[in-house]
Amino acid sequence: MPPQVARNLLRAARARAVFQSTRPAHRRPAAISCRFQSTEAVRQTPSDVYQAPPRGFVPRKEEKFVPTQSRKAAPAATLKLNSKNLSSLQNVSVPTYKRHGVKQGIVHVGVGGFHRAHLAAYVDTLLEQFNVQDWSICGVDLQPFAAPMRDALKPQDNLYTMIERAADGTSARVIGSITDYLFAPDSAEAVIAKMAHPDTHIVSMTVTESGYYMNENTHELQIDHPDVAADLAGEQPARTVFGYLYAAMARRHAAGLRPFTVLSCDNMQKNGDISRNMLVSFARHAGNNEVADWIASNGAFPNSMVDRITPRTNDEDKVSLAKNFGVEDAWPVVTEPFHQWVLEDKFVDGRPPFEKAGVQIVPDVHQVEEYEMIKLRLLNGSHSAMGYAGQLAGFTYIHEVISHPVYRQFVINMMQQEVKPLLPQIPGVSVDDYCNTLLGRFSNPTLKDELPRICLGGSGKIPQFIMPSIAEQIIAGGPLRRLTLVAAAWFRYNKGIDDAGNAFKVDDPMVEELQAKAAEGPIAQLQIKNLFGDDLRQDKRFVQELKTALEGLEREGALAMIEKYA
């Protein structure tokens, strides 16, 4: 055998960990083994070498993960993904439970990539390994732009492939936990009826930050937003998730049923509390105080922290899946090995045994908040730093940005010097090790996480991921130059032109207002009160830092400023 062929075969057979190491052998492409090393070994790992942490791993002292596994050779033929062909798929892990016999206890709104790599994957593990019978998922999309998802899932019997990519190999697993799918533009009534049905115990949602219609300054529902105003006026079909939740809750109240638990899986601190406040406010503004009081008194809105990097799927991913695993999937989801979910144990009408699938169930909302703060400010804050400053400098992927020495040093120093001192201390959790784990995750070259995905919807991200740290450093009198440069990079990004003069699309629900303000002057965007309030605008040190950073970005460009501030 030629040496190059042997090396290729060896590379194809390298270690890959599946979603759960305890998965039955017939579901698993191969066995795995794990070993742990001290944190000293982590620190000695070259900065450009990616090491995949175990799934659900919260970095603790004295732990380091190295997986080993092999998989079958590439298939000779391909098959379309559907229920009929499941048993014939040889190179992927497939469901063995009877999907048609499982009740749909969960309705999930927003069947995007993150949901399919996170909640749906956890539920699939429960269905496969623990004989859970009442908790499959009915997926729901509300907006017309989600029609391609409907068109992809329906012919595949709502099956899809989760492609898990580590630096040392790739695995594929067919997820079967979504057993029905409803598209609201086709039948809004069917969606409301499904939510109101007695078999529905949880309505979960991944609708992004902007889908909550919350004023970032007052934390109140934006009742003057056209979508919210239309729903409150009774226009059909509803435009917002709260229009559907309210209609379904009103029916359950009239029928004498319990409320369903509203489970936010969005990347926001206090996501459960926000969901509760927005829904109760919506009901009150709809003129139904009785239902509003009933929801407030009897409903459940658990807070959660969710984490898994999930890039956008592209045509190359589909071709690779067919070539290497023999699966023709109209819309697979690509993700990393790492995943984590910290969930408040606050449910009104039962829940699946999530902890069996690796979810960290905690009794206290403050524990969720602590994990969430660490994750949002370190992971998402660093993503924002790399995304906006990287886009301006002409980078394409996150792993390219973090591999550049200047950007890498900037991110490390921002995390260690400006963010870490503000974070809570959780017993048994090392923030230093978490930062090290993040650098490894960011460096994974196989994910190809595109910057436009990271930059999407900055008006909902910067006020959450960057501004709270700036505000706290202002109070503490601490360093904030790097954080301020990230905010300035977002202001500069909103012009839609990079440092080389190339135009790009600013994908943000507030894009018109942001760009109008950007045209007024360097820091005019800071005047948008529902994003920034009044306090930041009145702090002289911050305003001067912001002006200096913006002037530097305009004059010298992002790369030069990152180097200067690193």
From Swiss-Prot:
<protein>
    <recommendedName>
        <fullName>Mannitol 2-dehydrogenase</fullName>
        <ecNumber>1.1.1.67</ecNumber>
    </recommendedName>
</protein>
<dbReference type="InterPro" id="IPR013131">
    <property type="entry name" value="Mannitol_DH_N"/>
</dbReference>
<feature type="binding site">
    <location>
        <begin position="106"/>
        <end position="117"/>
    </location>
    <ligand>
        <name>NAD(+)</name>
    </ligand>
</feature>
<dbReference type="GO" id="GO:0046029">
    <property type="term" value="F:mannitol dehydrogenase activity"/>
</dbReference>
<dbReference type="Pfam" id="PF01232">
    <property type="entry name" value="Mannitol_dh"/>
</dbReference>
<dbReference type="Pfam" id="PF08125">
    <property type="entry name" value="Mannitol_dh_C"/>
</dbReference>
<keyword id="KW-0520">NAD</keyword>
<dbReference type="InterPro" id="IPR008927">
    <property type="entry name" value="6-PGluconate_DH-like_C_sf"/>
</dbReference>
<dbReference type="InterPro" id="IPR013118">
    <property type="entry name" value="Mannitol_DH_C"/>
</dbReference>
<keyword id="KW-0560">Oxidoreductase</keyword>
<dbReference type="InterPro" id="IPR036291">
    <property type="entry name" value="NAD(P)-bd_dom_sf"/>
</dbReference>
<dbReference type="GO" id="GO:0050086">
    <property type="term" value="F:mannitol 2-dehydrogenase activity"/>
</dbReference>
<dbReference type="InterPro" id="IPR013328">
    <property type="entry name" value="6PGD_dom2"/>
</dbReference>
<dbReference type="InterPro" id="IPR050988">
    <property type="entry name" value="Mannitol_DH/Oxidoreductase"/>
</dbReference>
<comment type="subunit">
    <text>Monomer.</text>
</comment>
<dbReference type="InterPro" id="IPR000669">
    <property type="entry name" value="Mannitol_DH"/>
</dbReference>
<comment type="function">
    <text>Catalyzes the NAD(H)-dependent interconversion of D-fructose and D-mannitol in the mannitol metabolic pathway.</text>
</comment>
<comment type="similarity">
    <text>Belongs to the mannitol dehydrogenase family.</text>
</comment>
